[in-house]
Amino acid sequence: MIIMKKIKKQIQNYWDKQPCNIKHSKKKFLSKEYFDEIKKKRYFVEPHIKKFANFQNYRGKNVLEVGCGIGTDAIEFIKNGANYYGIDYSSESIKICKTRLEAYNLKKKKALFFTGDAEYLSNLSELKKIKFDLIYSFGVLHHTPNMKKCFHEIYKLSSKNTIIKIMLYAKNSYKNYMLDITNFRYESQ
């Protein structure tokens, strides 16, 4: 148990020091232009995200994103009218999400962000009260030490009508191949 806590603390420190996609823009840090450039690059590199997420289909619906990072997909759900709830293990990423809301003038929209562990989602009392229409996670859960526990927690927060959309990177994918041969972890930069 102590070893697992140490590993989790190392994971949290890693993502706090270099939130995912943080270096994908040369624009003024945390400006709207900065976030626009990050969004443009994300959806250029992974254009399938928009179809997978179907951001526009969740107007007025409750969406939980597990592993929201710096909020690129969060903003799309929020702009399309979702009641959005995002959780990430990195407190730095959550701070950036909140700044991003301000940059897009979306602070008054229904959006709540939490720092937390996906292996203990149901411990967040705020989430237990909500009936989620969508639980979404893109490229996150395979980074957790106990992915099975994350799935169990997601199941606890779902109902019979909840849509669950989870994307995990395949070990033998083109993306992983390119990262391996270049020894470059672009996604975490």
Language-model segments: residues:
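A short glycine-rich, Lys/Arg-flanked "PGG" loop and its adjoining helix->strand segment in the class I
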Residues: 148-163
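N-terminal, positively charged/glycine-rich alpha-helical extensions of SAM-dependent methyltransferases
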Residues: 1-36
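Class I SAM-dependent methyltransferase SAM/SAH-binding core
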Residues: 61-66, 70-121
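Short catalytic micro-motifs in class I SAM-dependent methyltransferases
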Residues: 139-140
